[in-house]
Amino acid sequence: MNVGKKTAAAIILLIVVLAGWILIRTFNAKAWPKHKASALAALPPAALTHLSTAISIPTVSPQDPSRIDSATFLKYRSFLESAYPMIHQRLSRDIVADFSYVYTWKGADSSLAPLILMAHYDVVPVEPSALSLWTAKPFGGEIKGDTIFGRGSVDDKCSMIAIMETVESLLRRNFTPRRTVLLCFGHNEESTGQGAVAIVHLLQQRNIRAEMVVDEGGELTREKLGDLQRPVALIGIGEKGYATFELLVEKTGGHSSRPDKETAIDILSRALYKLRGEQTPRRILDPTREFLTRISGSSSDFPRKMALNNLWLFEGYVLYKMGEDKDGRAMISTTIVPTILESGIRENVIPSQARAIVNSRILPGESIKEIQEFIRKAVDDPRVKIRITGDFSTEPSPMTDYHSHVFKKVADAASDVEDDVIPVPYVMVGATDSRNYRAISNGVVNFCPITDGKGYHGIDERLPIKDFQRAIQFYTLLIQ
């Protein structure tokens, strides 16, 4: 009995000590330091008009490069030339792959590696069936109150026009940067991305290695982490991989009045159901752990604050909670989802083939080959043929060091355009042109101070004018 009592007492003491340690760590957690941002400068003259005009030119990049609307892209080039005369007088311009551009602004110290500011100006199309759901013309560039509407307002003409406005304004003040600044603009990021590939090839031919590359992708968010009651700067330091797989079933069809027990559609449907039921492994990556650590002291949700400040004990719980939300799930696991289904030619014909396209965004530490094998095991049916397809696939990218001066410079600039920002490293769940630039720089980051971008790739894409102001100030800080 004495031994039992001693054991029970020891267990109780251990629980009390453990609980005390957890509570001490929780209550002692320090919030990220607050910082008052500088006042936003007034927009340059005609800046809003220029953004509106840019949006009104429908630079849609088709999946088939041969079907590009050259006249529209040439119109956009003419717009840039007329809107930004100082840039076209003082900077050299290379036209790459027909419609991508590299502007070179020589710095005072040629020994310094250049800064690359990049964006893309092509956009995705607007679904005809969704036109009636828009409250403004998709390519109208209409300003309503404090917001500008239109395809590309967020993704990604805001970035491009903000960069151009920044440089044009600095040129008018006779400013010369210390290091050379390259402005790199792709014209088909939303399709093949070959413009960016060609730009990087050109820079490699010139033996250029960049100190820093800043592209779209990361943003300011208030809505996604509402319990913080502070804005968070999601600064992209790397990207998940990207791969598309075809699942194909071939089986003799026939007349719909005499169906077999199983058809090609049945087999494929069951395969997709099984695939969606299998969860890829969940892991907290090192940058994601740093992300959670930085926000942990500012949470107003006590259970969440306790869990985040004691990941050594609650990591499983945090993984579970993050997995309940689509944004959180994308941060901790490879995602696999069907995006296209094809089968059948008539209502009274049983098809002999059923095909699905499945898109995957691959967590760093995993590979395309491993995900293909995961799909094969999940489906577990040799009648379903699985292969990689699509015009583009890439393994997860290397990561930029979030302790580097490059990350700090972007974090400091983000903190100077919005009050009380918490800058965090973020593994991008989408693919951008910047992945190509890792061949010429170890300092690739993804960020533009847009706040919870609305409607991009969807309905009523729109940008608060204040975000446009922030973007111009952000790029000015990076250059200066």
PLM segments and residue spans:
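Short, solvent-exposed loop/turn and secondary-structure capping segments
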Residues: 65-66, 126-131, 194-196, 224-227, ...
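N-terminal Sec-pathway targeting helices
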Residues: 1-16
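Acidic/histidine-rich catalytic neighborhood of metal-dependent amide-processing enzymes
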Residues: 147-234
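Midchain, well-structured core segments that form catalytic/ion-binding scaffolds
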Residues: 197, 205-369
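Acidic/His- and Gly-rich active-site-bordering loop/insert found
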Residues: 14-151, 170-177
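A common structural junction motif
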Residues: 121-122, 275-280, 376-385
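Short amphipathic alpha-helices in soluble, non-transmembrane regions
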Residues: 262-263, 371-379
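An extended, acidic, His-containing surface patch that forms the Zn2+-binding/catalytic region
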Residues: 93-95, 102-104, 108-112, 221-222, ...
